[in-house]
C-alpha cells in the first residue's frame, strides 16, 4: 500500500529509510517550535497559542505535501518572515498582530493566484538572479541583527543632541529627550543572560563545525538546561513535561483582514508574497533536485506546481490558525541527505510536529538566550549565497547591495526589496543595457515608486 501511494520502489527507497529521513528532517527543524513562540510573543501573541498554530499548521501542511505532491519536504513558519512580522510590521509600524495575520492571509491568496496562473513564471523568470540571491542574503543579515539584539550581544545606545539638557531644564523635566543618533554597540558582557547567549552561540557553532545532525535543536536544549542549572531561569511550580493542548488559548480565526486592507498594507503584503514566492521556489527546486525528483538541466520539475500550491495554501492556513507565514523549509535537505525520496518522509515529519502539540509546558521553559543564537546562525547560513552575486558588474552588484544593506539597517524586508526593484532597471537603462531587463521589472519598479510617492 505504501509503495503504491509513495512510489517507493520507483524512487529506490524503503519504508525504513523514509521514516528515518523524516525523523532527521524533524530533528534539524524542531528548533522552530521554540523559536516561533519566543519571536511572536514579542508581538503580543500568547506563546501557547503560537506553539499550537506552529505544530498544527506545520504538521498538517507537511503531511499534505507528502500525500498530495509526494515530495520529501517539510513546512513550518519561516524564520525571516517571523522576524519581519514581529519587528517590522507589528513593533515597527504599530500594526496589531491580528491585522498582521490578515496581511499574511491575503499574501497567501495572492501567492496562490500567482501559482495557479502564468504570472508566477513571469515573475520568477523576470526577476534577475542577483536580486533573488540578494533577498536571501538581506534576510539573513536582518534576522542576524535581531538575534544579536535579543541575545543582548548587541545593544542600541542613544546619543542625545547637545542642547537636550537645556531643553529639559526649561520644561522642568517634562520633556522627553530627543535622540539625535541611535548607535549599535556591543552588549553588556557582564550580564548572565548575555553570557548564556554567547555560550549558546559558540556551542552551537562548534556542533555545526562538527556537522552534527540537529545542531540547532541540541544547542537550544543544552542552553535551556544550563540556564536552569545556573539559576538564570527558575522552574515554574507544578511543572509537567506533557499536557493536553489548551485550544481555548489558540488564536484560531483571530486575523483581521478588513483592517489589513483598510490600512493600505500593500507594501507589506507585497513583501510577504515576494519572499514567499522565491523562498518556496528555491527550496522546492533545490530539494527536489537533491532528491533526484527534478532535473534542472532538462527543465523537468514534476509536481512543482502542486508543491507551490500546497505551500501557498499553507501560508493562508497558518494565518487562520494564528501563526506567521508557513513555507517550505530548507532543512528538508537534511532528510533528503539521509535518503528521503518520497512524501513518506514529509508525512513522518508532519506526524512528529503534531505530537509536539502536547509539549507546551516544555516550550514555555526555553529562554530567549537559547533561541536568539539560532537567528544569528541561520542568518550566517543564508549569507553564504552572496558568492553568487556578480559584484564586478555594477549594474548587478549595486542593486543587490542596496537590497542587502537596507533590509537590516532599516529593519524592513520591504524597503530592501523596493530599493533593489528601482535601482536595477534604472542602472541598466543608464548603462545602455535596458534590453537585459524583463518588462515585469519595469512594472514592479513603477508600482514601488507610486507606493512611496503617494502612500
Kindly give the residue locations of the regions a language model identified.
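Loop-to-helix transition at the N-terminal end of transmembrane alpha-helices
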Residues: 44-63
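Helix-coil boundary and interhelical linker segments in multi-pass alpha-helical membrane proteins
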Residues: 38-49, 88-99, 263-266, 367, ...
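Transmembrane alpha-helix boundary and packing residues in multipass membrane permease domains
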Residues: 34-38, 54, 62, 83, ...
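Helix-loop-helix junctions within the multi-pass membrane cores of secondary transporters/permeases
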Residues: 2-32, 36, 57, 78-87, ...
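Helix-loop-helix hairpins and the membrane-proximal interhelical loops
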Residues: 1-50, 182-186, 218-305, 446-450
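Hydrophobic/aromatic residues within the transmembrane alpha-helices of Major Facilitator Superfamily
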Residues: 23-30, 60-63, 67, 144, ...
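Membrane-embedded alpha-helical modules
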Residues: 93-222, 347-455
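Juxtamembrane transmembrane-helix boundary signature
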Residues: 58-79, 110
Amino acid at each position: 500500500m505504501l509503495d503504491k501511494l509513495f512510489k517507493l520502489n520507483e524512487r529506490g527507497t524503503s519504508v525504513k529509510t523514509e521514516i528515518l529521513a523524516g525523523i532527521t528532517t524533524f530533528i534539524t527543524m524542531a528548533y522552530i517550535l521554540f523559536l516561533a513562540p519566543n519571536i511572536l510573543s514579542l508581538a503580543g501573541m500568547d506563546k501557547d497559542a503560537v506553539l499550537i498554530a506552529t505544530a498544527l499548521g506545520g504538521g498538517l501542511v507537511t503531511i499534505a505535501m507528502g500525500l498530495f505532491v509526494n515530495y520529501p519536504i517539510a513546512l513550518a513558519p519561516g524564520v525571516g518572515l517571523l522576524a519581519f512580522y514581529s519587528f517590522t510590521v507589528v513593533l515597527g509600524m504599530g500594526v496589531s498582530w491580528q491585522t498582521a495575520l490578515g496581511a499574511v492571509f491575503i499574501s497567501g491568496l495572492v501567492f496562490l493566484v500567482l501559482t495557479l496562473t502564468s504570472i508566477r513564471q513571469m515573475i520568477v523568470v523576470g526577476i534577475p538572479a542577483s536580486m533573488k540571491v540578494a533577498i536571501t542574503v538581506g534576510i539573513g543579515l536582518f534576522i542576524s541583527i535581531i538575534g544579536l539584539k535579543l541575545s543582548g550581544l548587541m545593544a542600541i545606545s542613544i546619543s542625545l543632541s547637545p542642547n537636550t539638557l537645556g531643553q529639559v531644564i526649561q520644561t522642568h523635566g517634562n520633556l522627553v529627550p530627543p535622540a539625535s543618533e541611535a548607535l549599535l554597540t556591543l552588549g553588556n558582557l557582564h550580564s548572565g543572560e548575555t553570557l548564556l547567549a554567547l555560550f549558546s552561540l559558540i556551542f552551537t557553532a562548534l556542533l555545526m563545525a562538527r556537522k552534527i545532525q540537529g545542531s540547532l535543536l541540541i544547542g537550544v536544549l543544552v542552553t535551556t538546561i544550563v540556564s536552569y542549572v545556573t539559576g538564570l531561569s527558575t522552574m515554574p511550580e507544578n511543572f509537567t513535561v506533557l499536557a493536553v493542548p489548551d485550544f481555548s488559548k489558540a488564536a484560531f480565526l483571530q486575523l483581521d483582514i478588513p483592517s489589513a486592507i483598510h490600512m493600505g498594507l500593500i507594501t507589506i503584503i507585497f513583501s510577504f508574497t515576494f519572499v514567499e514566492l522565491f523562498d518556496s521556489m528555491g527550496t522546492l527546486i533545490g530539494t527536489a533536485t537533491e532528491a533526484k525528483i527534478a532535473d534542472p538541466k532538462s527543465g523537468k520539475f514534476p509536481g512543482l506546481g502542486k508543491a507551490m500550491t500546497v505551500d501557498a495554501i499553507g501560508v493562508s492556513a497558518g494565518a487562520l490558525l494564528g501563526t506567521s507565514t508557513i513555507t517550505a523549509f530548507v532543512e528538508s535537505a537534511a532528510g533528503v541527505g539521509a535518503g528521503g525520496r518520497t512524501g513518506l518522509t514529509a508525512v513522518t515529519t508532519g506526524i512528529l510536529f503534531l505530537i509536539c502539540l502536547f509539549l507546551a509546558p516544555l516550550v514555555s521553559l526555553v529562554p530567549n538566550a537559547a533561541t536568539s543564537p539560532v537567528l544569528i546562525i541561520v542568518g550566517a547560513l543564508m549569507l553564504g549565497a552572496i558568492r553568487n552575486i556578480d559584484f564586478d558588474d555594477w549594474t548587478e552588484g549595486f542593486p543587490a547591495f542596496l537590497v542587502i544593506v537596507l533590509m537590516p539597517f532599516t529593519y524592513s524586508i520591504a524597503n530592501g526589496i523596493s530599493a533593489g526593484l528601482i535601482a536595477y532597471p534604472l542602472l541598466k537603462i543608464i548603462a545602455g543595457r535596458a534590453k537585459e531587463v524583463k518588462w515585469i521589472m519595469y512594472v514592479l519598479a513603477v508600482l514601488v515608486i507610486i507606493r512611496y510617492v503617494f502612500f
